[in-house]
């Protein structure tokens, strides 16, 4: 199982995408929006397909709050008319998709806690892997010897100290789904989308149901479906 922290460039991109979606919800009760973000080396590129017109100044402020003083390239295009009509008289499944929910394992919980503990001390780009008894910690801007004292059996920064962040790496939306969803990864990403998108709502529903029943959950839907797993999609 691999886990990255909130300062990993891919997660920074996810956070920016989520912030843009939040702006849409401030403007409309049920906006339709899909956001893609590419960030790195001083620039943040954003494309938003949306029913809402957003102020670029607000988008830029969100980027600066999350990622620092970057140059923001923001492109906004209207939602496709056929897709808009699909939701005209009620919330329906916004895309075809397959979805899987898997119970969280003790390994997942352990590594997630390790990631939180390290990030609380070193709030910088980091990636961590747990494979049985093998623990690999790659943490930027950290005192390697300090981490080795806390985790004496871990492989810490195998190539030595490193800086990380968007000055040395790029980040893109939905590129760390394994970190987000562990064994529940399927075809669609969670980030940068409104709640009518099945990649958000049905993925989360399947995950939560798997935790509730302690068994895998497999679902699928077609664009336009108004029920999933026997329940109204609008729920």
Residue spans of the language-model regions?
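A domain-level signal for the structural core that forms small-molecule/cofactor-binding pockets
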Residues: 1-235
């Amino acid at each position: 199982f691999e886990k990255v922290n909130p300062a990993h460039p891919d997660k920074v991109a996810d956070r920016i995408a989520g912030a843009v979606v939040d702006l849409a919800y401030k403007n409309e009760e049920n906006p339709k929006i899909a956001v893609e973000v590419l960030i790195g080396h001083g620039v943040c590129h954003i494309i938003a397909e949306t029913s809402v017109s957003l102020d670029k100044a607000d988008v830029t402020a969100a980027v600066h709050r999350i990622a620092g003083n970057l140059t923001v390239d923001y492109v906004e295009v209207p939602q496709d008319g056929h897709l808009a009509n699909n939701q005209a008289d009620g919330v329906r499944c916004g895309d075809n998709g397959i979805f899987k929910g898997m119970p969280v394992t003790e390994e997942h919980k352990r590594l997630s806690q390790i990631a939180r503990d390290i990030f609380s001390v070193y709030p910088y780009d980091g990636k961590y892997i747990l494979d049985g008894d093998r623990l690999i910690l790659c943490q930027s801007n950290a005192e390697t010897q300090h981490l080795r004292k806390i985790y004496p059996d871990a492989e810490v920064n195998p190539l030595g100290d490193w800086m990380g962040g968007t000055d040395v790496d790029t980040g893109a939306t939905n590129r760390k789904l394994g970190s987000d969803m562990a064994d529940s990864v399927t075809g669609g990403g969670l980030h940068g989308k409104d709640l009518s998108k099945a990649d958000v709502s049905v993925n989360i529903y399947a995950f939560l149901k798997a935790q509730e029943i302690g068994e895998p959950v497999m679902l699928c839907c077609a664009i336009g479906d108004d029920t999933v797993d026997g329940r109204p999609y609008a729920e």
